[in-house]
Structure formats: C-alpha cells, structure tokens
Amino acid sequence: MPELPEVETVRRGLAPVLEGARIAQAAVNRPDLRWPFPDNMAQRLTGATVTALRRRSKYILADLDTGETLLIHLGMSGRMQISGDVIGSFHHTHPAAAKHDHVVLDTDAGARITFNDARRFGAMDLMDTATQDQHWLLRDLGPEPLGNAFNEAHLVAAFKGKRSPVKTALLDQRIVSGLGNIYVCEALWRAGISPLRQAGKIAAVRVATLVPIIRDVLTEAIEAGGSSLRDHRQATGELGYFQHTFRVYGREGQRCQTPDCAEKILRKVQSGRSSFYCPACQR
C-alpha cells in the first residue's frame, strides 16, 4: 500500500494540473471501489473548481469551490494518471480507456486525470470542507510526521508506558499519521533501535532521535519519487526509485550495510507485517 512519500509524490504531480482547474466533466464508471461512491459523485464534481490539493496522512484531499472536498485513497494498486494537454512541458495524448479506469476527470484546460485501480482497494468520497476533520477516515489521525506537531515531546509522551513493540507503535496512525512498513523499518535501522523493543522501555533520549530520522527518511523518499515495489507510479507514469537505497527493507539474508557489521538482515512477522532489521546494530 502506498505510504506517505508515494501519496505526496502523486499529490505533487497532480497539483500543477488540478489546482485552479475547473472539472469540465467527471465520469464514474462503477458504483464502488472499496466502499460505495457518494451519491451523484460525477454530477457533484462536474463544474467544480479545485481550489487546493492537499495531503493528510495517506489521503489526497482536493478542496472544491462548491464547499466540498474530494478525498482520494489509492489503496493497494490505485494510480492517478495524467494525460492531455498540460503537464509542464510534456504532452500526453489521452490513452484508450483501460479495464480498471474507474473515475475520469477532464479539466477545462484539456488535461485528463484517471483513477485506475485493478484491485479496487482504493476509495473516493466527498465531504463538507468545513467539517472534514470529523470524517471517519480523518478524525482519529495523529500529527503529520513532517509537521511541527510531531516533535520529540509528543513521541516521548506517546510511548510512555506503551507495551507494544516500537514498530507497532509507529504504525499506529493515532500516534503519527502516514507512516507505513517500509519507512518505519528504514528509520529504526538508522536509529539503531530494534523493531521488537517494547516502546515504553526505550529511553526518552533514544525515542527523541526518531523524530529527525523519520523526517529525513520521508524527505529523501519524496525527493526520490517514492518506492516502486509493485504498483506505485508517479502521476506522470514514472517510477519512484527510493527502493534502490533501502538499507534493510526487503533485504533478508543480505549483509547489513553498517560499516564493519558482518551480520545479515533478519525478517520477522509482526502484526501481519514483515519487519527487517539487523540483530547486531539494532537493540
């Protein structure tokens, strides 16, 4: 599933095409994806102007001049694909409709944005912009890891007395939103903290080091266009390439990349997800 860097990469690719654009025509080609689409979604989108394109956690939020916000969740395999007349200095013709093109937005400037989702774990919803923080997918989210509210004091307090493993705690979207398996594994390796360690038993000074490390990992991943392991593509269709710099994720049995460390990377399943770590460097 796309994590924060992949979603932010897609948002940045869409922003030049969607922000300020009027949706001249919207087409919805099926009644649902993971959940049913809102009533009359195509009609409510047609004629609306996108005033801002934002990201919250792993969701893209398109604010409309109608007072509604379009929430987009990419799910496991969802892609937002741009074609048409305006993508910076590029020109992409509209491709023939594909089997899994579920939502199509045509702008008045000649661009087309297509939401393609083969597995149909993605979602779209419309909500009142003024009360969007109360939407059931958004209301319990913790602070953004790249925002000021995510700081050392917050994380130390969130971990205090917590019995779950540190990796599980970091994946808890109520503690910090947007983090996923890949980037938590990478951040814990950089911090030298085992994903198996009980969160509440890690010294506060070590917990505090996670904040800048998490920010660095996410920032580097965004700059690299995210990680393309299976389905992720940027809005222009390009692959991300952060996967080429992984230090632990997906490297089971390979040598740790810490200088002078001869240990091999281990994999352990935690809460249904694979954790990758070095047993020597991460304590």
Swiss-Prot record:
Subunit structure: Monomer.
Protein name (database record): Formamidopyrimidine-DNA glycosylase
Zinc finger (FPG-type) in chain: 247-283
Organism: Jannaschia sp. (strain CCS1)
Classification via Pfam families: Fapy_DNA_glyco, H2TH
Keyword Lyase found: yes
Gene Ontology MF term list: 8-oxo-7,8-dihydroguanine DNA N-glycosylase activity; class I DNA-(apurinic or apyrimidinic site) endonuclease activity; damaged DNA binding; zinc ion binding
PANTHER family linked: FORMAMIDOPYRIMIDINE-DNA GLYCOSYLASE
UniProt superkingdom: Bacteria
Residue numbers binding DNA: H100, R119, K162
Keyword Metal-binding: yes
Gene3D superfamilies linked to this entry: 1.10.8.50, MutM-like, N-terminal (3.20.190.10)
